[in-house]
C-alpha cells in the first residue's frame, strides 16, 4: 500500500524536522515526542510490509546487531537490581528475575533509555529500506538540508542581535553564554552543524554539477554558506576544529575532480564564486560577532589543561574494572558516576549528567560486550559504506547516491571525532541524525540491486516503487 508506506516516510521526515527545533531533543517532552514519531513511522512501515508482502533488503549483520543490542539492553532493564532514588541519593533494591545474572542498577533510567534506543535502532532499519527509493532518498536529503539551513540561520540571527537566550525563552538572571540556535549547549549545536553542513555542501555540489534550476543552485549554495558560517559563529572550539578538518578533506578529495571537469571560463567563474563566498563569510562573521569564538581560542592554552572533563574521565576510568561484560545498564552514567566520584582522588565538583567522552560512557553503561556491539554498528556501518562506495558496481549508482553516501561518511567521521571530548551521541536529535546516516551507510550494500531494478523498470516497463512515484 503506497499510501501507508508514504505516510510512514513523511512521519520520519517530520521527526528529522522536529528533533533539532525542539531544543535538540534535550528535554523530556521533546524526547517523548521524537519517540512517538519514530514509533508511528515504524508501526506504519511494518503494516505496509505485512500488507504488501514486501521483504526489505536488510543486511544480516545489521539485523543481528539490532537484535543483540535490543536484547542486551532490554534484559538489563528487565533484570534491574535496583532503582535510584534521586531525593535521597540512594539505590533501592528491587526483586529481579535472575539475581545471579547482570542487571541495571537503575530500572527507570534504563527502561526509558532502551525505549529510545530500540526506536533509533529500528530507525536505522527504516532508512535502509527508504534509501532504496531514488525519490525518497532525495526527499530525505532535501529535508536535512533545509532544516540545517533554518537552524543555522536562527543561530546567526541570535549572534547578530546579541540575544541573551533563545528568542522565545526568558534569559536567566546570571546570563546564558553557551546556547546556540535551539541548543542550550554550544557543543551539541556544533556537533549537529558538523553533521549537516557536509550534506548541504553535497547539495550545492549536486546543484552545480547537474542541470539544476538557477533557483536551486542559489538555494543550496545559501544553505551551505549559512551552515558553514554558523559553525564559525558558534563558540565550540572542538566543532570549529572538526569543521576545518572536514572542509580541508573535502577540498583535497573533490577539488581536483571538480577542476578537471570545468572549462577555463568555468574555472574563472568558480574562482570568482569562491572569493564571493569568502567575502560573504567574512561579512557574516562581522555581523554575528565572530570575535567571541576567536577570543575563546586565545585562552585555549589556559583552559584545556585545567578542564574538569579530564578529571571526570579519570574517575570514569577507575570504574572500568567493575563494568563486566554488560556494564551498569543503559543510561545509568548519571546515577553511577557520583558513587565513584565521591571517593576518587580526582574528585570533580558539580552534577554530571553525561561524561564528556562518549566512548568511555558507553563502556560504563554497556560493558565490554555491549560497547563492542555499538562500535561494530557505528564503525562497521562506515566500513560497509566505504567498501560499497569503492565497488565496481558503485560506478553505476545515480550521482545522488554517490554524493550522499560520501558526504554522510564525512559527517559521521566528524561526530566520531567530536565524541572523543564531548557527549554528542547522548543527545536525541544527534542520535536520530546519526541513525539516519548509518541507515544510508548500511543500505549502500543493497543499492546495487535497487539500481539494477530501477534500470530494468525503465527498459522493461515493470512496476515498482520508483515507477509508481
Across the structure, where does each feature detected by a protein language model lie?
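Transmembrane signal-anchor hairpin modules in multi-pass inner-membrane enzymes, especially those
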Residues: 1-146, 202-221, 248-277, 302-304, ...
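Membrane helix-loop boundary segments at the extracytoplasmic
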Residues: 20-26, 232-235, 359, 363-366, ...
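TM-adjacent membrane-interface loops and short helices in multi-pass inner/ER membrane proteins
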Residues: 185, 310-352, 359, 366-373
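Hydrophobic transmembrane alpha-helices and their immediate junctions
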Residues: 368-406
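Membrane-interfacial helix-loop-helix modules of multi-pass inner-membrane proteins that assemble, modify
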Residues: 77-104, 140, 150-191, 225, ...
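A membrane-periplasm/extracellular boundary helix in multi-pass inner-membrane enzymes
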Residues: 79, 153-162, 170, 228-235, ...
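Juxtamembrane membrane-water interface segments that cap and precede transmembrane helices
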Residues: 19-21, 25, 93-107, 169-184, ...
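Hydrophobic transmembrane alpha-helices of multi-pass, membrane-embedded glycosylation machinery
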Residues: 35-43, 197-200, 240-253, 378-381, ...
Amino acid at each position: 500500500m503506497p499510501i501507508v508506506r508514504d505516510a510512514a516516510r513523511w512521519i520520519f521526515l517530520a521527526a528529522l524536522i522536529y528533533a533539532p527545533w525542539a531544543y535538540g531533543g534535550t528535554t523530556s517532552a521533546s524526547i517523548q515526542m521524537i519517540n512517538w514519531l519514530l514509533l508511528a513511522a515504524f508501526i506504519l512501515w511494518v503494516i505496509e510490509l505485512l500488507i504488501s508482502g514486501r521483504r526489505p533488503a536488510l543486511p544480516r549483520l545489521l539485523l543481528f546487531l539490532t537484535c543483540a543490542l535490543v536484547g542486551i539492553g532490554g534484559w538489563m532493564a528487565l533484570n534491574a537490581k535496583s532503582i535510584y532514588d534521586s531525593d535521597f541519593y540512594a539505590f533501592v533494591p528491587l526483586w529481579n528475575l535472575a539475581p545471579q545474572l547482570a542487571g541495571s542498577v537503575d530500572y527507570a533510567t534504563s527502561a526509558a533509555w532502551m525505549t529510545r534506543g530500540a526506536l533509533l535502532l529500528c530507525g536505522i532499519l527504516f532508512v535502509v529500506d527508504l534509501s532504496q527509493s531514488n525519490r525518497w532518498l532525495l526527499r530525505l536529503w532535501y529535508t536535512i538540508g533545509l532544516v540545517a539551513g533554518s537552524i543555522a540561520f536562527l543561530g546567526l540571527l541570535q549572534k547578530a542581535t546579541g540575544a541573551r537566550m533563545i528568542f522565545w525563552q526568558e534569559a536567566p538572571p546570571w546570563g546564558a553564554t553557551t546556547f546556540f540556535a535551539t541548543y542550550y549547549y554550544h557543543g551539541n549545536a556544533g556537533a549537529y552543524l558538523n553533521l549537516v553542513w557536509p550534506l548541504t555542501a553535497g547539495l550545492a555540489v549536486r546543484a552545480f554539477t547537474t542541470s539544476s534550476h538557477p533557483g536551486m543552485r542559489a538555494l543550496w549554495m545559501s544553505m551551505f554558506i549559512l551552515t558553514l558560517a554558523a559553525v564559525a559563529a558558534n563558540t565550540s572550539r572542538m566543532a570549529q576544529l572538526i569543521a576545518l578538518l572536514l572542509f580541508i578533506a573535502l577540498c583535497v578529495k573533490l577539488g581536483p575532480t571538480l577542476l578537471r571537469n570545468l572549462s577555463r571560463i568555468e574555472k574563472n567563474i568558480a574562482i570568482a564564486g569562491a572569493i564571493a563566498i569568502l567575502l560573504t563569510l567574512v561579512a557574516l562573521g562581522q555581523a554575528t560577532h565572530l570575535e567571541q569564538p576567536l577570543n575563546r581560542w586565545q585562552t585555549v592554552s589556559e583552559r584545556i589543561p585545567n578542564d574538569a572533563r579530564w578529571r571526570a574521565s579519570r574517575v570514569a576510568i577507575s570504574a572500568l574494572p567493575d563494568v563486566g561484560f554488560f556494564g551498569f545498564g543503559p543510561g545509568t552514567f548519571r546515577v553511577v558516576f557520583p558513587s565513584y566520584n565521591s571517593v576518587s582522588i580526582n574528585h570533580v565538583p558539580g552534577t554530571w549528567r553525561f561524561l564528556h567522552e562518549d566512548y568511555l560512557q558507553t563502556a560504563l553503561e554497556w560493558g565490554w560486550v555491549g560497547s563492542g556491539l555499538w562500535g561494530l554498528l557505528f564503525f562497521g556501518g562506515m566500513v560497509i559504506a566505504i567498501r560499497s562506495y569503492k565497488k565496481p558496481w558503485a560506478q553505476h549508482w545515480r550521482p545522488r547516491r554517490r554524493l550522499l553516501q560520501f558526504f554522510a561518511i564525512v559527517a559521521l567521521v566528524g561526530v566520531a571525532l567530536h565524541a572523543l571530548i564531548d557527549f554528542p551521541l547522548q543527545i536525541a536529535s544527534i542520535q536520530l541524525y546519526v541513525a539516519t546516516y548509518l541507515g544510508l551507510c548500511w543500505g549502500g550494500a543493497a543499492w546495487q540491486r535497487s539500481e539494477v531494478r530501477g534500470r530494468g523498470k525503465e527498459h522493461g516497463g515493470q512496476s515498482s516503487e520508483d515507477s509508481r512515484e
